[in-house]
């Protein structure tokens, strides 16, 4: 493809990334795995250089007065780097997501249709402070035959630059083009990237709700991810208290900033008086602030919950509580206020659980367990690309299969459509092979 | 869900459609099939009424001076209506696309993950003149457990209104809510529909390229469809002339307005002098106008092709021809100018064919057969929802599986995430069942 000289540097970079992707996508499993092994080796050899660049990023961030949690995410110590490199080797050993034949059908004698797994092409991944994300994403991209254009957090610029150079140098010794892995460093480039429909096949944003929403609203490229994670737990009339308390505590407090932590607890009125006081005590011991509707306020000590609470992802040790008069009311509340992420029911009534799992319109519907299990690693996917709250697949926690698509191959021997139309039309055999 | 009185009628309609969808999605196969059978019966009983309304539409369109092809699409004669009703009965007998378990895994003892096929929710389908599309879409929607909001062509308003009433009346006698099938009648409602992200899960536009592009660019709701269909056929150095001629003629002339008809023929220079004259003669006999690059112009009588020709979907008996010096050049041309729809190679060289099928970045990659096979019915999908040229699945011709998604159900016995994290963390079993 000829690039006109008037096109921007990013345009050229994206064009070259697509060319690299077309080549990468035609490599076999061993060739892609060798490239991943070369990345692991290159990173291991360059550890001192990488850690030094990260130290510079950390020092600069500290001088700017960065918040402690962000600093911790930016900091790439030796043990974090080593375990990330070990993760690269894990990716090398994952099953190949490409080449799977999911349909193999004779349409007629000598005319055979195959649906074959193939890469998406070019991924645009925008992530925040954690520099090890660049390593993880690069190895997943190569495993799945995709080129990637990365944009890391501003604070991590030096780390990301060194990591990209090390990975590109490693790739240069393999059959994979170094142009398969690309780094953007300015915020302006994000907006331009979002307009490159002809080169970029999927955008994966990792960051705040507002950031993901901004991306979703400013691109025609498909976006894999989720803005909100407003998850619910519903304690049914037939809930078992000995399950309800530990699951509620786990779902709220085990990692409150996670998208799969609960924000609202729905409690059936039949058990509210019995359950809420011990629940409030258990949650209080973990430092959770409670906000309740009027019924809840009569039973336990809590702040009043307003309409806004039902729509809020606290990402913090805060829980809103509402008393509902039926399973139907719980389902309706979740379908209205939830973000289609993950919602659970605690009940010993299997019919109620089945109703809940069928009628709640979320990617994850859970019975008698914590919403915190909504995660690609916990599902056994090996690697997690993200969690999608869209309805169209891939939905929920997404592993490598979110980075691949398929194409239809049709192999004939001179077959033409006219043979199968009009008077005397030949019938298709449609015989699965 | 409570609807504020300030919301529009369409908002309320969409809200009610979503409620109907949640109920419809929880029905079993037999219940949904009974509703489809009731629709077929209702339509059969109401045939005189439907044909009369269609006659009115046709008379009004004729008075407005409607073009003949559009008139033919609008006209719903007795035989077309009967065969459409027969199609409804076919949908009744298709396999149920819902409820398939595509993953069933023990995460740990007593903690079982299932990925289960489920409906998308509410479909927005915007179609043109053909009133029978309303019947087809309604039956596919109910089969797949989805509600639908339909907008037909302006010319077909009377036909669509009667059809919708007949279908709703038929549904009222079943467990499916009549609110599952809805009709919009004004163009203004389309724009509002495109903004109803919270209710509508998928938009399926059927119409001109410009119309589909307009839809794609004006909604955050996923769109299933394709704007362009710029398909190619490449005659390789090792092409067999006895296959090349009939396949080229079929791919161009069998139905030139179809999206899977070819627009550009790429010819390897090694065979151009031998192949182009007989090809030009065969195409000329079918009334095809040829536009060639400079090399082509030296070999056959044709108009000059300009850069714009490589980007044009003629949808007519016009074919552009370009001579290329290698397989690589053919692949590059297709990846640059094609619309990722369907592209074919004619060659006796299997290595070249495999290279082509691997490196051409299209939903359909064909060897030694006509691109006209790109079609859900020909692929054996039973019913076609549309053809998608997006990279993310569903891609290519899409059957009922394009109207379904999945959710993850997790069934536990009090399991919490804390058990599996930190020191002394329990390992997951990840045992496929």
UniProtKB/Swiss-Prot annotation, chains A, B:
It is found in: Cytoplasm. SUPFAM superfamilies: ALDH-like. It catalyses: L-glutamate 5-semialdehyde + phosphate + NADP(+) = L-glutamyl 5-phosphate + NADPH + H(+). Its EC number is 1.2.1.41. NCBIfam families: PRK00197.1, proA. Belongs to the gamma-glutamyl phosphate reductase family. This is Gamma-glutamyl phosphate reductase 1. It comes from Synechocystis sp. (strain ATCC 27184 / PCC 6803 / Kazusa). The gene is proA1.
């Amino acid at each position: 493809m000829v690039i006109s000289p008037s096109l921007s540097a990013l345009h050229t970079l994206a064009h070259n990334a697509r060319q690299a992707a077309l080549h990468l996508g035609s490599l076999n499993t061993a060739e892609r795995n060798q490239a991943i092994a070369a990345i692991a080796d290159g990173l291991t050899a360059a550890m001192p250089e990488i850690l030094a660049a990260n130290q510079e990023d950390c020092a600069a961030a500290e001088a700017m007065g960065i918040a402690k949690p962000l600093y911790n995410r930016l900091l790439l110590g030796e043990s974090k780097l080593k375990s990330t490199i070990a993760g690269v080797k894990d990716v090398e050993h994952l099953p190949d997501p490409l080449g799977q034949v999911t349909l193999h059908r004779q349409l007629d004698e000598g005319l055979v249709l195959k649906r074959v797994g193939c890469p998406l092409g070019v991924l645009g991944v925008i992530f925040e402070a954690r520099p090890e994300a660049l390593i993880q994403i690069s190895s997943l991209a190569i495993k799945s035959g995709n080129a990637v254009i990365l944009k890391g957090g501003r604070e991590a610029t030096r780390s990301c630059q060194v990591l990209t150079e090390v990975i590109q140098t490693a790739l240069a010794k393999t059959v994979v083009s170094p142009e398969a892995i690309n780094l953007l460093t300015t915020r302006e480039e994000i907006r331009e990237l979002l307009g490159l429909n002809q080169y970029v096949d999927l955008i994966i944003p990792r960051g705040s709700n507002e950031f993901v929403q901004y991306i979703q609203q400013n691109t025609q490229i498909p976006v894999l991810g989720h803005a909100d994670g407003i998850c619910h737990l519903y304690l049914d009339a037939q809930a078992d208290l000995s399950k309800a308390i530990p699951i509620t505590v786990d779902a709220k407090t085990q990692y409150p900033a996670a998208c799969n932590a609960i924000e609202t607890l729905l409690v059936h009125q039949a058990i509210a008086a019995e359950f809420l006081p011990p629940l409030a005590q258990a949650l209080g011991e973990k430092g959770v602030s409670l906000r309740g509707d009027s019924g809840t306020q009569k039973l336990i000590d809590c702040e009043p919950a307003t309409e806004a609470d039902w729509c809020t992802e606290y990402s913090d040790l805060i829980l809103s509580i509402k008393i509902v008069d039926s399973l139907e009311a719980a389902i309706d509340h979740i379908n209205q206020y939830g973000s289609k992420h993950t919602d659970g029911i605690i009940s010993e009534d299997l019919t109620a659980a089945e109703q809940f799992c069928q009628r709640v319109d979320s990617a994850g519907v859970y019975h008698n367990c914590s919403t915190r299990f909504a995660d690609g690693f916990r599902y056994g996917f090996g690697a997690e690309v993200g969690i999608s709250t869209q309805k169209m697949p891939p939905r929920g926690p997404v592993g490598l299969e979110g980075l691949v698509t398929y194409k239809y191959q049709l192999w004939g021997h001179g077959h033409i459509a006219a043979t199968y139309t009009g008077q005397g039309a030949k019938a298709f055999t449609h015989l699965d092979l």
